[in-house]
Design a protein with these regions (language model features):
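WD40 beta-propeller blade core
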Residues: 86, 126, 165, 210, ...
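Conserved beta-propeller blade signature
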Residues: 75-78, 116-118, 155-157, 200-201, ...
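Structural signature of WD-repeat beta-propellers
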Residues: 80-81, 120, 159-160, 204-205, ...
């Protein structure tokens, strides 16, 4: 669990607590970590599905950022902390272009057919055309941790001080902004924004999800995915995690120390909600919603009613990524760079594939039967489920 503290209105991250799985950070004289919630050992199993490596490349280390690939058409866009940004062929991994932004990056990538956007150090928004040429840059109010959302001719970012700003994708002109009070403590995660034809769905600290009108940024509705509760600021963290998922006529979201659920995308009316806690986002298909809770359990719920379909507890405390459906499986990465493939039907482990030994970060993306993901050490891998 990573937590950022904010002071006044500048939104500067003062501290990142990365020791949720050990007690070493509480004892500076300890010679080695003392496990508090040790990660589950990888069980031996007989693979029931073939997974092949389609391609791998290295973009560069992520550092503390949670970069994730962005798919658009037949291309995948990736970025690294040192400023590297690349466009790859999604089928082969061949490099179409690679540039360096010239500044450290903190968030990315957001992309559509004509626009590529990242967040840079100091709260700078950098936007490029699909051929890698810089189009414009703009200054946000504070650090950007989540990939910019790019769609409908807009680039929308949320900064750590809880300010949401929409820029014109072509000119960089500011179209609108909305700011909400920022709590004193928030997850240092990669907060996401999803966009449809009418609205931007924004996950907020404090457990709120807001639908903003694309025309002017006005709130169309607001719902509580989590409710801050407890005696301490740490106990009261209830942030929406990851990118809200658009699934049919619903939009679904999950919160840390909160709930998982789906609401009507047009009205915000709750379809269903369950107690849940997650630091990462969700995956969805035409039947189910998939989520990995903070203890490493992978859960499937029916999309229409939230009925529990299955639960896999075999990956407990392995710091999982958001699970995503691919082929007949649900793919979920872990802190050692493994990608696990679970059955969509019952959650049984079907296959496992190793990468570079570092954590799978961000949210994997899927094209056809191939899942593409990025690790903290910089590997971008494409695995095909057969």
């Amino acid at each position: 669990m990573h937590i950022a503290a904010k002071v006044a209105t500048v939104g500067i991250a003062l501290a990142v607590l990365g020791g949720c799985s050990t007690l070493q950070s509480l004892n500076p004289f300890a010679s080695k970590p003392v496990p508090r919630n040790p990660p589950a050992a990888l069980a031996e199993f007989k693979p029931a599905m073939t997974v092949k490596s389609a391609w791998t490349v290295n973009i560069g280390k992520a550092g503390t950022a949670l970069f994730n690939p962005a798919l658009s058409g037949g291309s995948v866009f990736v970025a690294a902390a040192d400023g590297a940004i690349a466009r790859l062929d999604a089928a082969t991994g061949a490099q179409v272009w690679r540039i360096n932004a010239g500044v450290p990056l903190t968030a990315g990538v957001g992309a559509d057919a004509g626009t590529v956007a990242v967040g840079a150090a100091g709260g700078v928004v950098l936007v490029f055309s699909a051929d890698g040429k810089q189009r414009w840059k703009a200054q946000a109010s504070s650090e950007i941790l989540g990939a910019p959302a790019v769609a409908q001719g807009m680039v929308i970012v949320r900064s750590i001080d809880n300010r949401n700003v929409a820029f014109d994708a072509d000119s960089g002109a500011r179209r609108w902004q909305l700011q909400r009070p920022a709590p004193s403590l928030a997850l240092r995660s990669a907060p996401g924004i999803a966009i449809d034809a009418q609205s931007a769905f924004v996950g907020m600290p404090g457990g709120r999800m807001v639908a903003l009108a694309l025309t002017n940024g006005g709130p169309r509705w607001e719902v509580a995915v989590g409710d801050p509760r407890g005696a301490t600021e740490l106990e009261r963290i209830a942030d929406v995690s990851g990118v809200p998922v658009m699934a049919g006529r619903e939009v679904c979201a999950v919160a840390y120390q909160g709930r998982v659920g789906c609401v009507d995308a047009s009205s915000g009316a709750t379809r269903w909600a369950k107690e849940f806690s997650s630091e990462v986002g969700l995956g969805a298909d035409d039947r189910n919603i998939y989520g990995a809770d903070e203890r490493g359990n992978v859960n499937a719920y029916t999309r229409d009613a939230g009925v529990s379909v299955w639960r896999n507890s075999g990956l407990s405390n392995r710091r999982l990524s958001a699970p995503v459906p691919v082929g007949r499986a649900v793919a979920v990465g872990d802190y050692q760079g493994y990608m696990h493939f679970l059955s969509r039907e019952d959650g049984a482990l079907l296959a496992r594939s190793a990468t570079d030994g570092s954590r799978v970060i961000g949210t994997p993306v899927v094209t056809g039967n191939t899942v593409i993901f990025q690790t903290q050490a910089g590997t971008v891998a494409a695995l095909t489920a057969e």
